């Protein structure tokens, strides 16, 4: 029986693909070498230790229906669209070696006619007249007995959209965690016009088989049929949850301020594990009572726009005469934390 396994996803759902990756990684025999090929529709993928409010323009993402997905490996934030090809190499120890998987990808690119080289710990670059340009970034994860190397190749990604979502909105955040480093990038189509995802997958597959001297049939993974993977439903539910994608952010503080016709408002939030642990409100309003009550209500609240809005509007019962002010406040807060 071959020790190789080749899986190809026909889903563009980042939560589905990352759940498949997680299940395969946890359950594979330590003697197996796995290649998983996939791609995501419009998604910002953040590292395990990153803060989405700090890394991303979450409001713009929501407006444009761009998903957020937290991966289980470290590293920085990246934007995926269908112009990216994603790959994951997995192996048990001591066979796991990220230099091997890197060389397989480089061999695949070379077979396609692209001369690339490794740069630093995570990137593959090509030389252009304007200098080195990144075409691939990677991240890694290791446990006691296994490891994986996953990354992307830029084929024909919409590079103009990187700045739309990976530059945070102008929010006053003081946050802990990993900050993404922006790199100079280029698409492979600049070097190989017309190159497709399927051609790149075929080249990586051939290089994978050539390295190990074996071949196996590809397994197509599809959301149309629930993958036959133990605990997949639970893993997918976690991967797609707000608690994982947003709530796992490192502790941070958020300062919001706005001036309304009825007074200025300054909100100070401390947030841990997606919950507000401390809320302070400062105002020069002539009637500060609703705002003081709001500070108490927000303690322990999920740091989610709809939940904050709900707490604001709940105060209408106790302060009906301040309906206009509370509705303005509610709309502003909901927009500010998206």
Swiss-Prot record:
Catalytic activity: L-lysyl-[lipoyl-carrier protein] + (R)-lipoate + ATP = N(6)-[(R)-lipoyl]-L-lysyl-[lipoyl-carrier protein] + AMP + diphosphate + H(+)
EC number, as in UniProt: 6.3.1.20
Any one of the GO BP annotations: protein modification process
SUPFAM superfamilies, per database record: Class II aaRS and biotin synthetases (SSF55681), SufE/NifU (SSF82649)
Domain of life: Bacteria
Pathway(s) of this molecule: Protein modification; protein lipoylation via exogenous pathway; protein N(6)-(lipoyl)lysine from lipoate: step 1/2; Protein modification; protein lipoylation via exogenous pathway; protein N(6)-(lipoyl)lysine from lipoate: step 2/2
Principal place of residence: cytoplasm
Transmembrane segments: none
Binding site for (R)-lipoate: 134
Subunit (UniProt): Monomer.
Function: Catalyzes both the ATP-dependent activation of exogenously supplied lipoate to lipoyl-AMP and the transfer of the activated lipoyl onto the lipoyl domains of lipoate-dependent enzymes.
Protein name in the entry: Lipoate-protein ligase A
Organism this protein belongs to: Shigella sonnei (strain Ss046)
Lineage: Bacteria, Pseudomonadati, Pseudomonadota, Gammaproteobacteria, Enterobacterales
């Amino acid at each position: 029986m071959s020790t190789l396994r080749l899986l190809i996803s026909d889903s563009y759902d980042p939560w589905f693909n990352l759940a498949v990756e997680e299940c395969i990684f946890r359950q594979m025999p330590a003697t197996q070498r796995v290649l998983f090929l996939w791609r995501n529709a419009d998604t910002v993928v953040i590292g395990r230790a990153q803060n989405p409010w700090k890394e991303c323009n979450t409001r713009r993402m929501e407006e444009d229906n761009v998903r957020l997905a937290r991966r289980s490996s470290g590293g920085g934030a990246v934007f995926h669209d269908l112009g990216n090809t994603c790959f994951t190499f997995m192996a048990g120890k001591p066979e796991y070696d990220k230099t091997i998987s890197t060389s397989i990808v480089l061999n695949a690119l070379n077979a396609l006619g692209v001369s690339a080289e490794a740069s630093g710990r995570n990137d593959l670059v090509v030389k252009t007249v304007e200098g080195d340009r990144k075409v691939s970034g990677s991240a890694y994860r290791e446990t006691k007995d296994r490891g994986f190397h996953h990354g992307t190749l830029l084929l024909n990604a919409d590079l103009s959209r990187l700045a739309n979502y990976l530059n945070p909105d102008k929010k006053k955040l003081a946050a802990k965690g990993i900050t993404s480093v922006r790199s100079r990038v280029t698409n492979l189509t600049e070097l190989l016009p017309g190159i497709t995802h399927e051609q790149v997958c075929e080249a990586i597959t051939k290089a994978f088989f050539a390295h190990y001297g074996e071949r196996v049939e590809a397994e197509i993974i599809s959301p149309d049929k629930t993958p036959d993977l133990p605990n997949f439903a639970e893993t997918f539910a976690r991967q797609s949850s707000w608690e994982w994608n947003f709530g796992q952010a490192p502790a941070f503080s958020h300062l919001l301020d706005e001036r309304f016709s009825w007074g200025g408002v300054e909100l100070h939030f401390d947030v841990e594990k997606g919950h507000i642990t401390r809320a302070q409100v400062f105002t020069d309003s002539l009637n500060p009572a609703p705002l003081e009550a709001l500070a108490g209500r927000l303690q322990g609240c999920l740091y989610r726009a709809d939940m904050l809005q709900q707490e604001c509007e709940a105060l209408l019962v106790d302060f009906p005469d301040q309906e206009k002010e509370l509705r303005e406040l509610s709309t502003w807060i909901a927009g500010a934390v998206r």
